[in-house]
Amino acid sequence: MCIRDRWEAETTPADFAHYVHFIIEQLGSELHYICTINEANMGIQVAAIAERYKRQMMAQMQAAQSGGNSADGSVQVGINLQKMMEGQKAAAAENLEVFGVEKVENFTSMRTREGDLLILKAHELAKKEIKALYPDIKVGLTLSLHDIQPQEDGMERAKKEWDEEFMHYLPYIKDDDFLGVQNYTRSLIGADGQLPNPDGAELTQMNYEFYPEALEHVLRKVAKDFHGDLYVTENGIATADDTRRVAFIDTALKGIVSCINDGLPVKSYFHWSLLDNFEWQKGYSMTFGLIAVDRSTQTRHPKESLSFLGHWNQ
């Protein structure tokens, strides 16, 4: 795929379907659930944030130098957007040497509208391959979804943001067996787009707001239009204070129970993450885990939040 224009290539859906067919032939008898594509909307989110970053680059750099916020907290993944933009020239030279092209469109690259559609076509073809071989396997994908909250004069813009993040995917996923919901925080929207975090708001290591209520809000909003099963496939918090992780988990799970009590088909909760992981460009500095890891010895140290989640009962 790297030599065929990558995830923006017209051949990508067929290539992906061929890959899926091979995998299912080998492993299908052992599988009950398959997520074809993780965070199918990530490329569109990165593209929107990068565009905003370009417009605000100088202001953001000045703010960062004086202790202000960066743009990183507006995407639910550990990408250092400033370093990404600064490193584009060096990356182009390296890509040319390794792949023969200046720009490698990997899955988390800034995605065009056409590329976004190719992702959805790839999902549809993959689902067709899976169902043809093993019709009982449950198939879906996951989306990274913010709790989009319109503020004063922000109603129309918030509607547009939700369409980009979720609604325009609906025609392609409405018949899926399930949807994986991945949420970490909320997004406050004004007339011109995303607003800064509220003054005095508690922020996570990822620089977005500590707001565990977001998960319940997103599940309820999604369930209005998607009628398959809902799986919380990612939810958690990057923090060095494990008591805040415990509080986050408690609020998030109470929100799920409320949804289930109201009849929403929420079937699971997968916490992110079991271990303090390597978080994209931010490396090991983001501590999401229920278990800490000493990287010099690889020794695991369970945190109190691990026991709390394991024994949680409303």
Question: Residues of each region from the PLM?
Answer:
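Non-catalytic scaffold segments within catalytic domains of secreted glycoside hydrolases
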Residues: 1-314
